């Protein structure tokens, strides 16, 4: 009977013998100087980082593609404990920038995670900082990976409430955590070239007054604080929802925003209801772009917008509910690329359900209102002697079905199927791979040579300083065509 089990025992012995040989082969190591590691990158570079603020983590994969295992005697940072970089090798943090005795089996790999916290430099602009991560093999061969990042000093603000007049300067950006509040009775002045970088869930809350005094070539910038990239081709700064936005409360009047760039927020600019006796906001030569909610949300207040671009929002690009507004030479463009269920380019209303809010004035002059789709202008309007509703489109380019109303639609060009160029084809640059846009009219654009000269004379230069009145007939929108 036992003879019947002999083949089984012999097979088991052979298998164990083979396994032992396989394990022995797997655990063979080499000290040949020709056997080296392969790195997933020879350089790891961070974009500009705020000094003293920890970076995001980058991953380096270290491969051994040879037939024998490799032992790493030492892994260390070139500057060791003085390095602003930190490394974790195969789960082990490098103490004082050094670590010993690592192994990479044949046809295997280990992972290195790297971060950095850059010191303050005392300089106004970015300063390059570099180091090396060095691998010393058991053979004595040394391999290295270059590490680099640019340090940018900044004013770091946490939950600040301004209760008196304040001026922000331009020598370095402001990084804001937990929001910045301008209290009632206080004025915040932002000088030309000032940059405000808001952390996630932080925004600008204005109960007092904001004077953002940008200039051509020196805009005041409102943006998120992420300086790294989502993908190699896509900076986080080009994606929406990085910070909250700007909100003017009911107590806030007399605000001015000139040459401002507001982008990549959860909302753009929100104006709460105020008395119409005093202008709440004047915005000129500015951009509100790439927003995860509404671009402009205007509720029962008064505001003037000129030479301004409002574009690419998940919500409504310009939402108006009651109040008094004027838009002159503005480009309102709804080409939000990240979701198909985007809002309208323009929404006008004087009521929400049974709550009425008189629309005393919504005048659009020499402006462009367009986007994807055949109708991007919507509204909910009650008309009659009890409901004020004064809206006007004067020499505008409109992406909506034509309306026969000579009193409210004057000199309008309709974006319809009869036009040779429609929607995004009217503009110079639409790079939807890298999310780069230039809303300057193309040479054959329908937007060209259609604006009212009398209104253009009020703003003789476009948002980029190009002469608008040098043509016999100016272009609509905030940009004037110039040949490249």
Give residue ranges: language-model regions.
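Bacterial N-terminal signal peptides that target proteins for export
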Residues: 1-11
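C-terminal motif of bacterial Sec signal peptides marking the signal peptidase cleavage site
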Residues: 19-22
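Beta-strand/loop edge motif enriched in small/polar residues
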Residues: 24-30, 37-48, 53-59, 96-437, ...
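Short acidic/proline- and small/hydrophobic-mixed sequence motifs that coincide with surface turns
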Residues: 55-56, 67-72
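Asparagine-centered strand-capping/turn motif at beta-strand->loop junctions
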Residues: 62-66
